[in-house]
């Protein structure tokens, strides 16, 4: 951990995602109720460095860097930074942390993302705390869309990723051996065709 680490910081985390990793910082008690802290747009997890030491330390606080922010990996080129993508990031992070229920502390844009997550996965959120967050209102059809289609899309992607077998990595020697074996077996299955046995088709 760096010498200028935030007061009370107990660990810095790196959580694997398909495009790299999500960076996060943790404070408080590992046995305490979990709280996920979400920073504002173009900010990072360090925006909570001075606030969290002032909060009750019998909670477990994790402040994450959204993708493309702070120490987290940027998205792949050409992938846009949509609000719904950040909602999906939260679902990935809490799955990696093995949290079934937790509270959200969101600042500004982070509060909007946290609110959208709460609307999409209401059974997972214990409390939603918003700091300087713009008011956002959802029509009933938008709410239904979040609870059905967008939620289903997030869960489907995560299920597909979880069911995939890990990629196999071969050494150069293994690759050459596999190629040699394939060429040998294909050569043995070749049949010699007598010359003159093939004639052009007449029109």
Swiss-Prot record:
<feature type="active site">
    <location>
        <position position="108"/>
    </location>
</feature>
<dbReference type="InterPro" id="IPR050266">
    <property type="entry name" value="AB_hydrolase_sf"/>
</dbReference>
<dbReference type="Pfam" id="PF00561">
    <property type="entry name" value="Abhydrolase_1"/>
</dbReference>
<feature type="domain" description="AB hydrolase-1">
    <location>
        <begin position="33"/>
        <end position="145"/>
    </location>
</feature>
<keyword id="KW-0378">Hydrolase</keyword>
<comment type="similarity">
    <text>Belongs to the AB hydrolase superfamily.</text>
</comment>
<dbReference type="GO" id="GO:0016787">
    <property type="term" value="F:hydrolase activity"/>
</dbReference>
<dbReference type="InterPro" id="IPR000073">
    <property type="entry name" value="AB_hydrolase_1"/>
</dbReference>
<dbReference type="InterPro" id="IPR029058">
    <property type="entry name" value="AB_hydrolase_fold"/>
</dbReference>
<protein>
    <recommendedName>
        <fullName>Serine hydrolase-like protein</fullName>
        <ecNumber>3.1.-.-</ecNumber>
    </recommendedName>
</protein>
<comment type="function">
    <text>Putative serine hydrolase.</text>
</comment>
């Amino acid at each position: 951990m760096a010498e200028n680490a935030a007061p009370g910081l107990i660990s810095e985390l790196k959580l694997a995602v398909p495009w790299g990793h999500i960076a996060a910082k943790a404070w408080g008690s590992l046995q305490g109720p979990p709280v996920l802290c979400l920073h504002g747009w173009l900010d990072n997890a360090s925006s909570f460095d001075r606030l969290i030491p002032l909060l009750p330390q019998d909670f477990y606080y994790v402040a994450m860097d959204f993708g493309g922010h702070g120490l987290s990996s940027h998205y792949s080129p050409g992938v846009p930074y949509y609000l719904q993508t950040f909602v999906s990031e939260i679902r990935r992070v809490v799955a990696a942390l093995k949290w079934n229920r937790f509270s959200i502390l969101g600042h500004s844009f982070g509060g909007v993302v946290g609110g959208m997550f709460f609307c999409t996965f209401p059974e997972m959120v214990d409390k939603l705390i918003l700091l300087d967050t713009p008011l956002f209102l959802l029509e009933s059809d938008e709410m239904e869309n979040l609870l059905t289609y967008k939620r289903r899309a997030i869960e489907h992607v995560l299920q597909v990723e979880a069911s995939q077998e890990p990629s196999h990595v071969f050494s150069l020697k293994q690759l050459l051996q596999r190629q040699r074996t394939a060429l040998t077996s294909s050569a043995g299955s070749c049949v010699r065709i007598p010359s003159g046995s093939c004639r052009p088709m007449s029109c």
